[in-house]
Amino acid sequence: MNLQMIQAHIQQRLQPHFSADEIKAFGFWILPHCEDLPENDRMRALEMICEQLKQQIPIQYIFETAFFGPLTLKVTPATLIPRPETEELCHLISQKNKSIESSNGPIIEGLDIGTGSGCIPIYLLHHNPQWKFTAVDVSEDALDVAAENAFHVGVHDRIQLNQSNFLEWESLPHNIDLLVSNPPYIELKEAKDMADNVLKHEPHLALFTPKNDPLIF
């Protein structure tokens, strides 16, 4: 079973639901997975993946994998799938790190609010070996994923993960040099216009702003 065979099969099964470009991209995800399976199990696995895709389950959740810059991170339905815009933000911050002033010399103390998979602080720690981060989230399940990602990337000794609701804080820690966040900002009234793969499968806690206030954070 090669890439062309996989693409032909998923095109037949998914053509009414996805564009040609999407089907082609799915093939590059699925091929390595199928190649690692015994021949007799490959078609069964392919059928299972196609059924999940037809249910609009994001392929990142099917494989519990998201690519974020040079990093391969774990994602689950407890965490938002990292967006390209977030990657661009991380790249911009990392490029401008020389202009960030710190009271600790070259050591930057960062804080990420609503860390989810941990993609933002882990990316920044990966690119800036002298930085340290505290990352908070209200979701214990999301923090478990972030901990796995930090260990996998090798930055676990420079990140502290805390379960906390930022909206209940009275003030920010005094030793923070850099504050980053990608908080929920979508109002519930916008849900009707959202794609099923987002609305039905990504965590509403990370999508919809509390009290329908996009500026609450």
Task: Name each region found by the language model.
Residues 1-24:
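Non-catalytic nucleic-acid substrate-recognition regions in nucleic-acid-modifying enzymes
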Residues 16-19, 129, 155, 203:
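Proline-centered flexible-loop/turn and helix-kink motifs
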Residues 88-193:
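Conserved SAM/SAH cofactor-binding pocket of Class I
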Residues 184-216:
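Mobile active-site "lid"/loop adjacent to the S-adenosyl-L-methionine
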